[in-house]
């Protein structure tokens, strides 16, 4: 019976994606499934997918990260400023990754070493990064429109390679296995000799790397850096992971599939609701209600990453 339940749970995200796509195809018609809109869906889901894949290890050990959108914005701003000063396009990817990894490392160290709840430490990082971006930009923008945005070939290659890397980490390495074990039972993990602090911090480094790469592609796609960059990304990532089947309590529910399927579901849902004429304010209400319902059925109350671990 337990095996049947587990198999059904694994199938639900895929079935949900098919249902959501079918419903909006019927309601929106060619406006929804036209080539132009499908390309828009892929572009919108790319950042969520990439970041979602990266932070999967954080959620695997029962953590949570509310700072991803703000860290993405800060990384893009610093990279755009560095490019304007140096004039070397290659500096963009270097700076976005270094800035994002540094921010995530700080969040990880504060969470793990100071025993600050991850929701609090990541919110502090969010406020700090947003404050820096707003203070520096002062509602101005930094344009990099002279640089060509990568086509879907390179972007897809990066996504596939990164998804494969995260899959290998989760399935075959100590980093993935130990983070999932920590999410299942942190006390048992410590008792078995796992260096809990080290592997949790490594998870934040992986997440930071993903945010940095996503920031690079996002900056080139938009062609401009503004204070609006990254707003709402954290909730889209969390909702995507949960809709994809990952439990916020962590553990062995953490999979690559969660990030990919969940990202497509949340973006298709948002896009479809807009196409059929649902006001933006109501879309937020719908997303919030769905997120709450899924959370109620997936997390274990005593293990949600709201308390010091």
Feature roles, as predicted:
Residues 13-25, 55, 126, 130-131, ...:
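Hydrophobic core segments of alpha-helical transmembrane domains in multi-pass membrane transport
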Residues 86-127, 161, 261-262:
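Alpha-helical transmembrane segments within multi-pass membrane transporters and channels
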Residues 10-15, 41, 49, 70-71, ...:
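Hydrophobic alpha-helical transmembrane segments
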Residues 211, 226-285:
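Transmembrane alpha-helical segments in multi-pass inner-membrane proteins
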Residues 5, 114-175, 201-202, 221-230, ...:
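Transmembrane helix-bundle core of multi-pass membrane transporters
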Residues 88-96, 102-107, 151-226:
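Helix-loop-helix "hairpin" substructures at the membrane interface of multi-pass membrane proteins
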Residues 1-23, 164, 184-198, 271-309:
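Cytosolic-side transmembrane-helix boundaries in multi-pass membrane proteins
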Residues 19-28, 34-85, 114, 241-253:
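Single transmembrane alpha-helix segments in multi-pass membrane proteins
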């Amino acid at each position: 019976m337990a095996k049947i339940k587990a198999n059904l749970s694994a199938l639900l995200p895929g079935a949900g994606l098919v249902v959501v796509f079918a419903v909006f195809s019927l309601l929106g018609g060619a406006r929804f499934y036209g080539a132009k809109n499908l390309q828009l869906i892929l572009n919108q889901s790319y950042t969520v997918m990439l970041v979602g894949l990266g932070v999967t290890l954080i959620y695997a050990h029962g953590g949570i990260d509310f700072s991803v959108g703000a860290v993405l914005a800060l990384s893009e701003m610093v990279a755009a400023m560095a490019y304007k000063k140096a004039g070397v396009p290659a500096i963009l990817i270097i700076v976005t990754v270094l800035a994002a990894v540094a921010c995530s490392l700080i969040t990880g160290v504060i969470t793990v070493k100071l025993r600050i709840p991850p929701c609090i430490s990541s919110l502090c990082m969010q406020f700090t990064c947003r404050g820096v971006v707003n203070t520096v930009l002062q509602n101005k923008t930094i344009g990099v429109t002279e640089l060509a945005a990568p086509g879907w070939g390179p972007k897809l290659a990066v996504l596939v390679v990164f998804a494969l890397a995260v899959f290998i980490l989760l399935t075959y390495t100590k980093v993935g296995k130990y983070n999932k074990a920590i999410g299942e039972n942190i006390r048992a993990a410590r008792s078995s000799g796992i260096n809990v602090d080290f592997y949790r911090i490594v998870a934040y480094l992986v997440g930071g790397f993903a945010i940095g790469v996503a920031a690079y592609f996002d900056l080139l796609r938009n062609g401009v850096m503004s204070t609006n960059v990254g707003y709402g990304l954290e909730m889209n990532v969390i909702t995507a992971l949960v809709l994809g089947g990952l439990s916020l309590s962590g553990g062995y529910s953490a999979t690559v599939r969660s990030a990919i399927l969940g990202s497509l579901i949340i973006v298709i849902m948002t896009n479809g609701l807009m196409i059929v004429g649902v006001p933006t304010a109501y879309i937020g209400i719908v997303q919030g209600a769905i997120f709450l319902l899924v959370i109620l059925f997936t997390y274990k109350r005593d293990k949600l990453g709201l308390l010091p671990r």
